[in-house]
Amino acid sequence: MTAEEYDDAVTMAIERRRRTIEAEWNELGTVVLIGAGHPIPIPGRADRVYPFLAHSEYFYLTDHQRPGAVLAYDPQEGWSEFVPAISADERLWSGALSDEAGTPASELGPWLERRRGRRVAQLGAPIPNAPSDVAVAAELRTQMDRVRRRKDDIELARMRLAADATCAGFAAAVPFIAPGVSERALQIEIEAGFFRHGADTVAYDSIIASGPNAAVLHHLPTQRLLGAGELVLIDAGAEYRGYDCDVTRTYPVSGDFSAEQAAVYALVLRVQRAAIERCRAGVEYRDIHLAAALDVAQGLVDAGFLRGNAGDLVEQGASALFFPHGIGHMVGLGVRDAGGYLPGRSRSEAPALRFLRIDLPLEPGHVVTIEPGIYFPPHVLEDPEIRRQHRDTVVWKSVDKLRGFGGIRIEDNVLIRDGGNEVLTRGIPKE
């Protein structure tokens, strides 16, 4: 496909997305404003700002990174895009950060004034001095989330390219894993691999966690040196044209797992493979998570870390001490993509469900992460109240032997298809 053909395909995809959204929104008859957002200043850093990323709801319907822009929809007249002019000073210091095709942003006020008395709702980033019906906006967002969860061909093509860059980054970093190498050095290698293979940026702050740091779910890399016999957990991904990849692998620093590490790794891998197999259209994601929690609980019983019935251990929260998060989340336009809860469903406070990020039936076109993990976090397992509460379900003598173990997580991105699924990140070895 030539560059011109690709641009035409993107244009057609945007038109299809807008038509699909129109069919949802027209019933409400609401004027909709979708803000791209503005650059965010870095506190105390003079005129520096964080790298700009347009709000995902705006980007989805424009494919533009335009600071300060607003996409407007009037069911009676269609779509309009209002774009700020780029000043001479901005061109001097930063160049043309975006194209200016569209209606001048100064015309948004008069455009709204001509629609005075009609209901207006805002999506995307907040638009100063513009009205918004909050309740209607929530309904519009629910409709948009439902559409956005199903990835079209352009989105999937970008996600595959992000996955390719991610695969290249892991391939570049893994040979450097050795005692005496710092977490930061591994971050440099993996992210350089992303960029060398076409990534625009990283999908999120890379997690490089060695030794006990691997028990911290979102540990940021430091100058800590990897120790012989330890584990190192790498959770990182590339972004391409707004679309993200999110992968985790866990490696033995010295090249081979110890017996204890191998047993826990085999359990996590077994749980992940079973969860991926369950990822099919029509299956409730909550059920995939709960089945994984049961598998973890039974595996910890078999390994001698827990005692009792697996179902009871999940319900009582004993297994959540070691598997504290959900099985995954939506991924795509952003590392955590469009809303994962159906209307009328809310988060549960049950120990095994507190951090569940998706509660809906899977559909073809959804892309989710599947990322079970088992951790031995000292701040949890050394808490006297937790030890007292779970004295009958946790075999503390066995658990205490794994102080400093850290944790193991394995994560892949799974596309739901008619009749099955496809693992987009299968090119990154995990055994």
Regions found by a protein language model. Name each.
Residues 1-431:
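Active-site neighborhoods and metal-handling regions in enzymes and metal-associated proteins
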